């Protein structure tokens, strides 16, 4: 556990970057520091590995004050990932990742074997091993940065806005990859971001900081969304925090209806049989994966003009995705139906906005009931 105890960072000109901050950061979890510019997020992160020394207070790692350890020893127990990867431009990808193992005395062969293993773990093709950083995309460079930070198998990983410089699609991929890696490795991660959606998605606990480095609230994401501590936190979370909260309600209980499916290569008899089943038919490929919605009369036997199909929105996986994902799929679909798929992307049913709304009301009711029981104890 990392314990930050009444830590203040005051610079010689009188600027206070962090003001009496106290946090307990649990082991094997992702703790996110989030807040507006100037709230001391990065300063706090840098104090954990002594890139910046606190003016007052103390930081303990597993019960020991970090100032009692040599700086180099402390930093070798912590991986560090920054916004723009910070790769060595003159080294290959493999040797960038192998840097820390080599510094720790491993042979060149051992370090490179470890680097190759980590390339696979972070989703990088080992065919990229001999390339240089400038030959990689921004997302690939960030994966290299994560791999390098993990190379010495540190128990602690510090991440300073690592995904903010990439586009939204790549950012989501990197976030998902981090969650997968964390599930496998169980590191103690301190993650800095200014993006509240990223904080809610990744964080086991989220610390919201005010300008001037003061703690506004420290709580699990679901609690943060349901009970913001004050007007500042509520405003920072944004007007759509109710929608975000749906991310913590499972979709497993949704009652699916049989999807009115028709294969893209259906013959005239099949089309005729399905034509009266529903006002819209969900056209699928030969493997049962959805392609789009169509009115029955617009389909021609033996062939489907895919450009004329209506978008089916974003599918969701029951039991894996949340009610937010299901609602998103229904809202995006012109039919008002969300398409449910299995793990292979095959359509397994549909659910209406009305049914999703009923599930949301039931979920809120259960939360309120549990809150009432807790208050009565």
State where each predicted segment sits.
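The conserved cystathionine-beta-synthase
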Residues: 259-279, 283-287, 303, 315-344, ...
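The feature captures the beta-strand-to-loop junction immediately N-terminal to the Walker
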Residues: 34-36
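Hydrophobic anchor residue at the start of the ABC signature
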Residues: 146
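Helix-to-loop junction immediately C-terminal to a conserved catalytic motif
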Residues: 49
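Conserved signature/switch motifs of ABC ATPase nucleotide-binding domains
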Residues: 134, 152
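ABC ATPase NBD coupling module
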Residues: 65-79, 103, 109
């Amino acid at each position: 556990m990392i314990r930050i105890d009444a830590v203040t960072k005051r610079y010689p000109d009188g600027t206070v970057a962090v003001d009496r901050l106290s946090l307990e950061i649990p082991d094997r979890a992702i703790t996110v520091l989030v807040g507006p510019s100037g709230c001391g997020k990065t300063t706090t992160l840098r104090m954990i590995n002594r890139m910046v020394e606190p003016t007052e207070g103390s930081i303990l790692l597993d019960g020991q004050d970090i100032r009692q350890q040599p700086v180099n020893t402390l930093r070798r127990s912590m991986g560090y990932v920054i916004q723009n990867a910070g790769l060595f431009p003159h080294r290959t990808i493999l040797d960038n990742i192998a840097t820390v193992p080599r510094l720790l005395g491993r042979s060149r062969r051992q370090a490179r074997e470890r680097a190759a293993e980590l390339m696979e773990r972070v989703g990088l093709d080992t065919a990229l091993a001999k390339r240089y950083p400038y030959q990689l995309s921004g997302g690939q460079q960030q994966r290299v940065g994560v791999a390098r930070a993990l190379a010495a198998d540190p128990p602690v990983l510090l991440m300073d806005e690592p995904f903010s410089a990439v586009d939204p699609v790549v950012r989501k991929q990197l976030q998902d990859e981090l969650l997968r890696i964390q599930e496998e490795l169980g590191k103690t991660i301190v993650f800095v971001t200014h993006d509240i959606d990223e904080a809610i998605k990744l964080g086991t606990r989220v610390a919201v900081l005010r300008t001037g480095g003061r703690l506004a609230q420290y709580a699990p994401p679901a609690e943060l969304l349901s009970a913001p501590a004050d007007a500042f936190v509520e405003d920072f979370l944004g007007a759509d925090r109710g929608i975000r909260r749906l991310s913590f309600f499972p979709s497993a209980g949704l009652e699916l209806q049989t999807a009115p499916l028709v294969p893209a290569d259906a013959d005239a008899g099949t089309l005729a049989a399905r034509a009266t089943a529903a006002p819209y038919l969900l056209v699928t490929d030969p493997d049962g994966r959805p392609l789009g919605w169509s009115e029955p009369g617009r389909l021609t036997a033996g062939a489907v003009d895919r450009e004329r199909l209506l978008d089916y929105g974003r599918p969701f996986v029951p039991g894996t995705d949340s009610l937010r994902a299901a609602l998103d799929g229904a809202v995006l679909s012109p039919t008002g139906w969300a398409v449910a798929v299995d793990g292979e992307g095959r359509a397994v049913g549909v659910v209406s906005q009305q049914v999703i709304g009923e599930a949301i009301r039931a979920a809120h009711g259960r939360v309120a009931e549990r809150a009432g029981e807790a208050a009565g104890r």
